[in-house]
Amino acid sequence: MKLSFLDPLYARPGPWAAVYLDTSRDIEDPEKAIELRWRHLRDALSGQGVDNATLSALHTAVGSDREVSGRHGQALFAAHGRLGLAEELPEPPAADSARFTSIPDVLPLALQHAPDIPYVAVALSRAFAETDLEEDVVVHYQAGRWPMSRVAPEPRYNHIGAARDWPANAFAVAHELENLRRWTDAETIVLRCAAEDVWLRGVLVNHLPESTQQHVVTVPDSGRPVAGPGRALLEAELNDTLRATVNEQDRTLTHRYMAQRARHPDTSEGLSAAITALQRGQAHCLLLTRPVNLPESLWAGPEPTHITLMEPDLHSFGVHTGRQEPAGAVVVRALVGTGAELITVPREELSLEDGVGVLLRYHDPYT
């Protein structure tokens, strides 16, 4: 998974105030609940030395996701009186948190972006026209990147036409779907239709290129709404289909990692090996097992590659005034700063020393 969405947070210096809070709308009086949550977090930040201008910038953003229904959260980052990044979270944080650190505490946000699968969702159904008893074919479709699109959906497109004209209309819809798939590099098309509408599905899929047809996954029409306010089209069906998968790039990198580990186990897994690779700019990607179990903190210097387990180790970089920072923040800064990627895998699928593995850009024969 590429981490370029975090670039704005490294474009200007900290310290950064990072807030993760539950902003779910599936409770009674959510505005009051969010206000109370924010009040506690604001007090915590104030106690950590956050200035009033930065607190004000965060206050303006808290709860601004009112158009998103259901369970979700927010991740907010601000420094020097300016909001640096605000994102909705598909899952509310297990516990609200507020930290004021030199390096932005972004690992919880990065983990919610995974597995970052590009897709196109299609809902295909029949409906009776309002003016007569003639049936219409109704198509809704939308691209996205799972799972962040659950709460930050892309534009939705719609097509309604007479069922008798479907063979001709399906050609145009298939053309639009293929263009959308190519534009977004979608790896799968999740198509929902009723069992009795197999003909509608067949006509549509047969108009897609053969290379695209093999990426179509058909799911039954459960009768659930195609989407809630501010939510992704076919969210429930996408969750069932994509929650246990990874994107194609991450799958390829994981296979490469397994081959590397078989040849060079000592430099391929464990926190120490990963830190060494990050110090050298040698890491192509970092693998973390879920749930993530990094230490509470690491030592950091002013540059992304200044990352160590112990403070004296910073001296080799000429750094004599290092600081302890949240381990996840230091690791992700090193990944972004060296152009490395992040992959998360369930612990039961891949056992790694310290829950950490590193795929190297090159192997140093002297290590």
Where are these regions (language model features)?
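Terminal alpha-helical anchor/extension segments at protein ends
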Residues: 1-367
